[in-house]
């Protein structure tokens, strides 16, 4: 018999009476009146092993076994006694009567119990190998594998070719910071780890590969958040000779396929499409969570001439905005709740949170409860009630500031209220999956510090055909052929139709204040390639980490990555990054200059 005949979790009634050889780890050991029970665990689950004292040598070995010992068990499958079955396990109707027990490797006492759900993330990441033994982590990483496999199956079936692109490439610092790799053989020069395979996949389209994909690591040296890592994985795709609509349809079908085959979820037959401008107007976000049934009401024009300066000042400012959200039955919220929300929006730059409780609509301003009503004229009060659709028992929250602050703060408040216990109890949030496309993004954003336009997506995104003239006359009006796939408030994929003509790409560089000499130095290889009959092409990249996080219901993408970094971009398991010795630095022609200590 080989070392292992079956996985522990796959031993079922079909094997009754048969001899098996199992390998795994001790999940739990119990001594019941001279009989020892061992729950043996492997990646497929648990099986109960019974060690009785009839076999003295085996029983003696079982007495010395402790949690996380690695064992080989040989025995016979038998039914569990009546009343001792466990419906929660695949193997819950059987047990294995142990004939031979071999300790393949003992274990020191683990620093925590694997079934402890209250571990700190620091503990989990420091002892990641043990953390990965936990059933939830096993489930998450196997789910990740299945998502990748199903994406590959779909793309393979449509003629996409998996092509690897370089990991050591050229630094083109547009956007996030690059991770740099010094070149020993070219002193003073550096490679960069790719933030995406963007330019290489475009070159593959010029090279007539037609359809490309890659499940690929990408790197960005940026401040981390719950949904960011310095190294992350993309399902990266590019295709030639398809329109924007055809590209969206193709990859919408891919996501539907992946969800159906991996977690049995049927997504909408057709994802809704929303303009970027509409998303910002209604939700203050370009990745709206459509499960939350709260929307913005714009009031900027209605409060321009009120005495309340908190409203009228931003309402008369070029980039100002005044908006509100009506919360049905929000009149039930206590003053403590309102104060808590006020502190919450300050995180996003808001100076405060104005509110009106609607006690009785029919009474007009007399039916409203708020410290701000006295500062609003009748026309403004009427507009607020009518536009928000306020009813008795509602509360209206307001934000008034620069548009970005209003969108960020009121958008965050919308989600917080919607997903709160109050929101769930009052039907303000739906369950399930709400996908959509957000399209027609601005081509450029204005950087006040540098006094120039920067690419909102990246500088290789094509402008809409009817906006080509704006590249040289009015870049702020220029919209892009860009699209994001959004699911439950997360951007899970982003892409665009690319620029395939050299003269258009050069115009975009000029709009970005990248002169011809700089463009040739940084992107000459692309500009040259575009002159050799480059085909119309476009693509998309999906965040594999984000998709799996959502499917698994995990709190962080660190729960679906085997060996993630912390929010300080450190690996607590290996203690990376680490110092290197002086000899290595000399070989790389590098001298360290430590930052000045902060006072």
From Swiss-Prot:
Pfam family for this entry, one: GAD
Cystine connections: none
Enzyme nomenclature, EC number: 6.1.1.23
Record keywords: Aminoacyl-tRNA synthetase, ATP-binding, Cytoplasm, Ligase, Nucleotide-binding, Protein biosynthesis
Domain of life of the native organism: Bacteria
Keyword Cytoplasm: yes
Location in or out of the cell: Cytoplasm
Family affiliation: Belongs to the class-II aminoacyl-tRNA synthetase family. Type 1 subfamily.
Subunit structure: Homodimer.
Protein name, per record: Aspartate--tRNA(Asp/Asn) ligase
Lineage of producing organism: Bacteria, Pseudomonadati, Pseudomonadota, Betaproteobacteria, Burkholderiales
